[in-house]
Amino acid sequence: MKMTKDQKTCRKLWLEHVRESGGIVHTRPPIGDENGFCLVAMPCAYNSRHAKFYDVSFAWCADNDVFDRKVGEFIALDRQMFGQTTKLPGYIIDNMLEMDLVD
């Protein structure tokens, strides 16, 4: 999938918005048999790093797809911005950070 100029611009703006809001964007390329993914987590309380809950969106890479970091980020950010999220407790995100699963 090639990104259009509009998609590239949206990705940059959304990425900046997520980071300024205390959110997390993490992309992991495929490793061995595991698929690659992009995770976007936004605290439900604005700019609160230790929020009790996060709105989380994912973009997964299928086995036969080539995973492109920027495309994965765009898909996950698009889902985040348009409300296609799930809520996760903050301790799960904190545990992932401690285990070095996300940046």
Predicted ranges, named:
Residues 1-103:
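Catalytic phosphate/metal-binding cores of nucleic-acid and nucleotide-processing enzymes, i.e., regions
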